[in-house]
Curated annotation (Swiss-Prot):
Protein name: PDZ and LIM domain protein 2
Gene: Pdlim2
Subunit composition and interactions: Interacts with alpha-actinins ACTN1 and ACTN4, FLNA and MYH9. Interacts (via LIM zinc-binding domain) with MKRN2.
This protein's UniProt keywords: Cytoplasm, Cytoskeleton, LIM domain, Metal-binding, Phosphoprotein, Zinc
In-chain residues carrying the UniProt-annotated modification Phosphoserine: S124, S127, S129, S134, S137, S143, S163, S199, S204, S205, S209, S210, S263
Protein role: Probable adapter protein located at the actin cytoskeleton that promotes cell attachment. Necessary for the migratory capacity of epithelial cells. Overexpression enhances cell adhesion to collagen and fibronectin and suppresses anchorage independent growth. May contribute to tumor cell migratory capacity.
Length: 349
């Protein structure tokens, strides 16, 4: 449907476009701002812009169309091609609630039709027709296709026919009629489809059509948890050796060797080292054990750093060196005062 829209300005006009000759698509309105100038002029998302101010937009690039719209004077005259299915409540590229509900119902209807076609294919008259010599040659009045709420296992007639183990256990059973075992006609060539009749209110579940459990199903997870719960807890080898050593020690025997860092043999040197305290030096000046830093004066002679001072002035000799005068330590100044001859001094730096 062709129509013309006049958007009263000035810019900005309140809508966005996409497409162009460089995108090989027509120029389409993709978004309309709520309560804007474009919405007031009845411009809608999905409208195809045919001409801008009388100039054809078919051969325009995207940037060229944007520039012409932005630089246009008021009013902006747009010739549009609007689809008949465009919803008037569509805003910013999203449909209204009515349109979304219609699409959702259509998808549900399509899904329901596909399921119905699959069920009718599984239970076609050719696949459900019994053999002439089978006990079900006379079909019951109620057809299994007409029953609602049935859960069907084994839709594929061909796959069950090629499986003798499954063919012997899956038979078409009806209420009030004897089975093939009761009639004495148990053979793998009988009908290989079994229909379980339930209450009409329960819908059919397509997941029951598989004989194998899926790994992500709740039933499979529950079975795995039950198996893990019944399994005996595993004991590590190191814990088992430690338990045997403790039991042997309780019985009064020789404890077994545990090959780990916690074994008695491995911890023996550590215990001896902790039992023997380190040897402490004794300060020769104050006769107190030196527990931290010690100053070694001569072999076997140590002092505290605070006791390593001049005997006359108390100056610390750590950075200056000491001079012996008898058995006392002096600095160089007071040592020279006690002896006039330098040769009598005994110095050590």
């Amino acid at each position: 449907m062709a129509l013309t829209v006049n958007v009263v300005g000035p810019a900005p006009w309140g809508f966005r476009i996409s497409g162009g000759r460089d995108f090989h698509t027509p120029i389409i309105v993709t978004k309309v701002t709520e309560r804007g100038k474009a919405e007031a002029a009845d411009l809608r998302p999905g409208d195809i812009i045919v001409a801008i101010n009388g100039e054809s937009a078919e051969s325009m690039l995207h940037a060229e169309a944007q520039s012409k719209i932005r630089q246009s004077a008021s009013p902006l005259r747009l010739q549009l091609d609007r689809s008949q299915t465009a919803s008037p409540g569509q805003i910013n590229g999203e449909g209204s609630l009515d349109m979304l509900a219609t699409r959702f119902q259509g998808s549900l209807r399509t899904h329901h039709n596909s399921q119905s076609s699959q069920r009718s294919a599984c239970f076609s008259p050719a696949s459900l027709s019994p053999r002439p010599d089978s006990p079900f040659s006379t079909p019951p009045p109620t057809s299994p296709i007409a029953l609602s709420g049935e859960n069907v296992i084994g839709c594929s007639f061909q796959s069950l026919t090629h499986s003798p183990g499954l063919a012997a256990t899956h038979h078409l059973t009806y209420p009030g009629q004897p089975t093939s075992q009761q009639a004495g006609h148990s053979s793998p060539s009988d009908s290989t489809v079994r229909v379980l009749l339930h209450s009409p209110g329960r819908p059919s579940s397509p997941r029951l059509s598989s004989l194998d459990l899926e790994e992500d199903s709740e039933v499979f997870k529950m079975l795995q948890e039950n198996r893990q719960g019944r399994a005996a807890p595993r004991q590590s080898s190191s814990f088992r050796l430690l338990q045997e050593a403790l039991e042997a020690e309780e019985r009064g025997g020789t404890p077994a060797f545990v090959p780990s860092s916690l074994s008695p043999k491995a911890s023996l040197p550590t215990s001896r080292a902790l039992a023997t305290p380190p040897k402490l030096h004794t300060c020769e000046k104050c006769s107190v054990n030196i527990s931290n830093q010690a100053v070694r004066i001569q072999e076997g002679r140590y002092r505290h750093p605070g006791c390593y001072t001049c005997a006359d002035c108390g100056l610390n000799l750590k950075m200056r060196g000491h001079f012996w005068v008898g058995n006392e330590l002096y600095c160089e100044k007071h040592a020279r005062q006690r002896y006039s001859m330098p040769g009598t001094l005994s110095s050590q730096a």
